[in-house]
Amino acid sequence: MSPQTETKTSVGFKAGVRDYRLTYYTPNYKTKDTDILAAFRMTPQPGVPPEEAGAAVAAESSTGTWTTVWTDGLTSLDRYKGRCYEIEAVTGEKNQFIAYVAYPLDLFEEGSVTNLFTSIVGNVFGFKALRALRLEDLRIPPAYSKTFIGPPHGIQVERDKSNKYGRPLLGCTIKPKLGLSAKNYGRAVYECLRGGLDFTKDDENVNSQPFMRWRDRFLFVAEALFKAQAETGEIKGHYLNVTAGTYEELLKRAHCARELGVPIVMHDYLTGGFTANTSLAHYCRDNGLLLHIHRAMHAVIDRQKNHGIHFRVLAKALRMSGGDHIHAGTVVGKLEGERDVTLGFVDLLRDDYIEKDRSRGIYFTQDWVSMPGVLPVASGGIHVWHMPALTEIFGDDSVLQFGGGTLGHPWGNAPGAVANRVALEACVKARNEGRDLAREGNEIIREASQWSPESAAACEVWKEIKFEFEAMDTL
C-alpha cells in the first residue's frame, strides 16, 4: 500500500499535545544525498530547550502542527517529515543555536522557489516558542537543482554575446533616479555609454510613473544605446526595468524590449516575486535577452543577524529562479557587506562547486551540477579610488556599477564614464603585470590620472569620500 493511502490502525490515535522533539528531533539521522539541508540560527524563548526548539522548526516547516491529528495515520510521517538532526551552540552568543534540519525531496514542487520558501521560511518564523529565527544557509541537492533552468544565459554566454573578456564589466545607474523626462533620460544614457561604460541601468524605483512612462523610456534608451554602439564600435546595453504590477504587464514590457532589439532587461526579484521572476527567466532564455536582477527589499529580510534570511540563501534562490546579474554589495562602498561573507555568496553565485567553509558563512558544500553562473554586481557609493579594491575583490567575472561615481563627475556624464574606464583598464593592466592592487592601488590610479584629465578630475572630487561604518552582518 502506498504511503499516501496506508492506515496505521495498529498504532491507534491518541489525541493531545506532544513535545515536538519526540517526533522531529533525530540526532542519529544520516542525511541523504537527495535531502534539502537547512541551517537555522535560533534563539529559543527562556525555558525552551534547544532540542525542542529545533524540533519545532523542523515540524512547523514540514508536516507538523501544534497538536496530534488523526489524519497522521493516513500517511507515512517518517517519509515526509523534516528532521532536526544536529544542534550546535553559537560561540560567543547566549542562548543561541544553529539547528540543522533535513527535508525529504518529496515535500517540494519541482522548479518552484515559491513552494520551497513557502515551507522552509513560512509560518515557522512567527512561532512563539522562538524569540528569533534566521535561515543561514541551504544545501540544494542536484536532484532538485536540476529541475530549475537557472540563469537564462550565464557568464560565458554573456561574454560571448558582448565580445568582452579579461576584465570586469562597467555599469552606471542613471541619476536622479526619479523625475527625469524620457528624452533627458535617454540623453544621460547616451553620454555614459559613449564615454566607455558597457551598461547603464534603470534605478529599481523606475517602472512607469507619470513623469516618464515605460514605453517612452524604452524608445529613447534604445535610440541612445544604438547611437553609442555605432560611435564606439562596442556592444552596449541598458537594463530596462520591466517590473510591473501584474505579470501580464511585465511580459508586455519584456516583449517590447525584445522587439526594440536591446540585449538586456531588469527585474526587481524580491518585490516582483519568485513566480514572476522564474517566468521572466524562461522568457529571456527563449528570446535571447539577458536578465539583470535587483535585490530591492533584501535588507528588510537579511540585515538583522538574529532573524530573517541570510542573503546567501536569497542568492541561491535567485540562481535557481533565474538571473544573469544580481546586486551583491561592494565591501568598500556605502551599502552593507563584510568581505568574507560577501565573497562567500559571490562564489555561490558564480562557481559550479563550492566547498563548505564556515569562515565565510558557507554551512554546506554546494554542487550546482553545471547550472550557469550569475555575475555579481558591485554597486552603491563607489568611485574611481575604489577601483583597485573592487578589481581585486571581485575579479573579472563581475559588474562594477558607478552611479553617482559617474554622473557626479564635475565635467558631466561622458567624462565620468571615461574616468571609470581609464581607472579600470589601469587596474587590469597593473594586475596582469603582477602588481599588488591592494597595496599599490592608489599609486596605480594616480599614474593613470597623469594621462587622463577626466580621471584626474574625478580623483580630486572624491579623494575624501569614505563610508567607514561597521557591518551589521558579521560572522
Swiss-Prot record:
GO terms for cellular component: chloroplast. It is found in: Plastid, Chloroplast. The modification N6-carboxylysine is found at residue 201. Residues 1-2 form a propeptide. Keywords: Acetylation, Calvin cycle, Carbon dioxide fixation, Chloroplast, Lyase, Magnesium, Metal-binding, Methylation, Monooxygenase, Oxidoreductase, Photorespiration, Photosynthesis, Plastid. One of its GO terms (molecular function) is magnesium ion binding. SUPFAM superfamilies: RuBisCo, C-terminal domain (SSF51649), RuBisCO, large subunit, small (N-terminal) domain (SSF54966). The keyword Cell membrane does not apply. The active site is at residues 175, 294. The modification N-acetylproline is found at residue 3. GO terms for biological process: photorespiration; reductive pentose-phosphate cycle. Signal peptide: none annotated. Mg(2+) binds at residues 201, 203-204. InterPro entries: RuBisCO, RuBisCo_large_chain_AS, RuBisCO_lsu_C, RuBisCO_lsu_C_sf, RuBisCO_lsu_fd_N, RuBisCO_lsu_N_sf, RuBisCO_lsuI. The record marks 334 as: Transition state stabilizer. It catalyses: 2 (2R)-3-phosphoglycerate + 2 H(+) = D-ribulose 1,5-bisphosphate + CO2 + H2O; D-ribulose 1,5-bisphosphate + O2 = 2-phosphoglycolate + (2R)-3-phosphoglycerate + 2 H(+). The keyword Transit peptide does not apply. Substrate binds at residues 123, 173, 177, 295, 327, 379. Its cofactor is Mg(2+). Belongs to the RuBisCO large chain family. Type I subfamily. The basic functional RuBisCO is composed of a large chain homodimer in a 'head-to-tail' conformation. In form I RuBisCO this homodimer is arranged in a barrel-like tetramer with the small subunits forming a tetrameric 'cap' on each end of the 'barrel'. Heterohexadecamer of 8 large chains and 8 small chains. This is Ribulose bisphosphate carboxylase large chain. It comes from Huperzia lucidula.
